[in-house]
Amino acid sequence: MAGGREIKTKIKSVQNTRKVTRALEMVSASKIRKAQERMKTSRPYAQAMKQVIGHLAQASTDFQHPFLIEREQVKRVGYIVISSDRGLAGGLNNNLFRKMLGEVRPWQDKGAEIDVVTIGQKASAFFRRVKVNMVGSVTHLGDSPQVEQLIGVIKVMIDAFIEGKVDRVYLVYNRFVNTMTQKASFDQLLPLPAAEHKVAHHDWDYLYEPDAASVLEHVMTRYIESLVYQAVLENVASEHAARMVAMKAASDNANKMIGTLQLVYNKARQAAITQEISEIVSGAAAV
């Protein structure tokens, strides 16, 4: 059994760790509310853009935007992967990466090449380690990311798709369901799925200046950017939720460990006192 001094040192160490985990839990609990507000605020914009594109696509029947055309043969697949910059978020990032590798494997079995654009330090480090072809990366977006920070890496994939270098693009991120649940999501970004640009038929019509095709050309890129931005906000909220839960679990485990160590310390102290009493009694009997 370890000595009393050694056990007290361990207790002190665990108590210090508990202070850190509690602080991180409280910080994440505070940040998650703001992250949820930003996430909910941006949703109506993406939904409105989706409706606009649906109307434009149906209004311009003689023009089909490249983003809406499904390609017969897929030779190269692009992924925009969103992760956190920091760790201590449980299995949030690793679960996403593991599922993505499972999604990639069938494409590789068909002979398709894989290109990846990463958003977040954890994704960048992971895909460098597994030697996947990274064509773009952005990190350190902070807790309040701006769409301007993402335009560069989004453009990399958009240009590759337009030029025919990539035949399909997926968006990979953690969707925020609630504080306890974050779901790894794989959304097809390009070409846009048919359901994305179909709207219910209405009797009214719109006038577009100069024409529907020109407006669609301009709006389409903004829509793709809004989808990626929304996914980043979802991932930020997921990160804070996962970290809050992970740090609470760590604090609870620290409490249990402190209780166990305290019990061991009390037993060791009791054994030492008992031994001292026995030695005193034995010494007195010898005299």
Swiss-Prot record:
User: Some GO term, biological process aspect, for this entry: which one?
Assistant: proton motive force-driven plasma membrane ATP synthesis
Source organism superkingdom: Bacteria
Signal peptide (UniProt feature, chain positions): none
Query: Entry's InterPro entries?
Result: ATP_synth_F1_ATPase_gsu (IPR035968), ATP_synth_F1_gsu (IPR000131), ATP_synth_F1_gsu_CS (IPR023632)
One GO CC annotation? proton-transporting ATP synthase complex
Q: Which GO terms describe its molecular function?
A: ATP binding; proton-transporting ATP synthase activity, rotational mechanism
Main location group: membrane
Q: Which PROSITE patterns has this protein been placed in?
A: ATPASE_GAMMA
The keyword Repeat is assigned to this record = no
Question: What are the record keywords, sorted?
Answer: ATP synthesis, Cell inner membrane, Cell membrane, CF(1), Hydrogen ion transport, Ion transport, Membrane, Transport
Membrane topology term reads: Peripheral membrane protein
Q: Where in the cell is it found?
A: Cell inner membrane
Subunit details for this protein?
F-type ATPases have 2 components, CF(1) - the catalytic core - and CF(0) - the membrane proton channel. CF(1) has five subunits: alpha(3), beta(3), gamma(1), delta(1), epsilon(1). CF(0) has three main subunits: a, b and c.
Q: Which family does it belong to?
A: Belongs to the ATPase gamma chain family.
* Known role: Produces ATP from ADP in the presence of a proton gradient across the membrane. The gamma chain is believed to be important in regulating ATPase activity and the flow of protons through the CF(0) complex.
HAMAP family per the record? Answer: ATP_synth_gamma_bact (MF_00815)
Write down the PANTHER family for this protein, in alphabetical order.
ATP SYNTHASE GAMMA CHAIN, ATP SYNTHASE SUBUNIT GAMMA, MITOCHONDRIAL
Xref: NCBIfam families: ATPsyn_F1gamma, PRK05621.1-1
Q: What is this protein called?
A: ATP synthase gamma chain
What gene is this protein a product of? atpG
